[in-house]
């Protein structure tokens, strides 16, 4: 049974900051498994490019929501919310504290705050919009979105065709503005939530990210990306590390440039993560090495 005597510890931070090592120490202190909050580690075909926990690390501490789905599978933050809450019901029967760790902002919010109950669009509406996009580009779709949902139009990234199309397909399928489904209050959870954020100075983090990309290449990222190249159209592969390698395979850039772009885009993603996390005043921030002892004390 979940009660306020049970605690979900959320270890979060940007890519490359050092969450994995500290998460293992925290989980061992708690004596419980780790729940991954990484929207790409959930796909079994992508262990290298997503820096998924190794078999040795998973043998040391069980990990949930790692390698459980194929990139061919549809998976969403809403599905993740439901499945994690079900898993926590069982885990809290055995453990007073459980660790959730990752850097996927939407997945963390899904568990901690809940996400909006947005209806699925009609398949024929989605197909028609994607056909329009392929034939005409995004301008006409943007104009229609602006007419039907000016609030969402004002804040959506208008270069991201998937988000633009998603907003319009919900408008057309439901007869309501997509923005009208967005809630602003968090759902209540029957357990305490303690958020632990990890940070490093920007220069230090960038060096770690660049080095990690080189390490991924040595581990076989190129071969991993080639194996899923025939599936490049899937949303799961619209991901840093893979889309750059696909450009290399297409012949539009060389291998060295692909690596540089992975490093650059990983640094950009880390900045976006920190921008998102800084909006949450409930996060307590720590350095993963200098403050390690304080963090471990916090979870005991």
Swiss-Prot record:
Catalytic reaction equation(s): adenosine(37) in tRNA + dimethylallyl diphosphate = N(6)-dimethylallyladenosine(37) in tRNA + diphosphate
InterPro entries in the record: Dimethylallyltransferase, IPT, P-loop_NTPase
Coiled-coil intervals: none
Chain's gene name: miaA1
Gene Ontology biological-process entries: tRNA modification
Protein name (database record): tRNA dimethylallyltransferase 1
Keyword Glycoprotein in record: no
Organism of origin: Porphyromonas gingivalis (strain ATCC BAA-308 / W83)
Keyword Transcription regulation: no
Domain of life according to the entry: Bacteria
Chain positions recorded as ATP binding sites: 13-20
GO terms for MF: ATP binding; tRNA dimethylallyltransferase activity
Cofactor: Mg(2+)
Swiss-Prot/TrEMBL keywords: ATP-binding, Magnesium, Nucleotide-binding, Transferase, tRNA processing
Family matches, as Pfam families: IPPT
């Amino acid at each position: 049974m979940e009660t306020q005597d049970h605690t979900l510890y959320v270890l979060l931070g940007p890519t490359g900051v050092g969450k994995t090592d500290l998460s293992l120490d925290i989980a061992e202190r708690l004596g419980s498994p780790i729940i991954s909050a990484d929207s790409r580690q959930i796909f079994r075909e992508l262990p290298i490019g997503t820096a998924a926990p190794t078999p040795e690390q998973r043998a040391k501490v069980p990990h949930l929501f790692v390698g459980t789905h194929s990139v061919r599978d549809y998976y969403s933050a809403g599905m993740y919310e439901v499945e994690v809450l079900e898993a926590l019901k069982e885990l809290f029967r055995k453990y007073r504290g459980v660790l959730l760790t990752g850097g996927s902002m939407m997945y963390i919010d899904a568990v901690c705050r809940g996400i909006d109950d947005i209806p699925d669009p009609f398949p024929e509406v989605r197909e028609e919009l994607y056909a329009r996009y392929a034939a005409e580009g995004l301008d006409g779709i943007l104009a229609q979105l602006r007419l039907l949902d000016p609030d969402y139009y004002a804040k959506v990234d208008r270069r991201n065709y998937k988000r633009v199309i998603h907003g319009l397909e919900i408008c057309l399928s439901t007869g309501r503005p997509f923005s009208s489904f967005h809630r602003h209050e968090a759902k209540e959870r029957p357990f305490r939530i303690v958020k632990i954020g990890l940070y490093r100075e920007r220069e230090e983090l960038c060096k770690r990210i660049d080095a990690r990309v080189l390490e991924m290449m040595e581990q076989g990222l190129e071969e991993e990306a080639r194996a899923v190249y025939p599936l490049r159209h899937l949303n799961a592969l619209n991901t840093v590390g893979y889309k750059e390698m696909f450009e290399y395979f297409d012949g539009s850039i060389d291998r060295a440039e692909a690596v540089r772009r992975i490093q650059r885009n990983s640094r950009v993603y880390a900045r976006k993560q920190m921008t998102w996390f800084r909006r949450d005043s409930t996060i307590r921030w720590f350095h993963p090495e200098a403050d390690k002892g304080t963090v471990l004390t916090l979870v005991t």
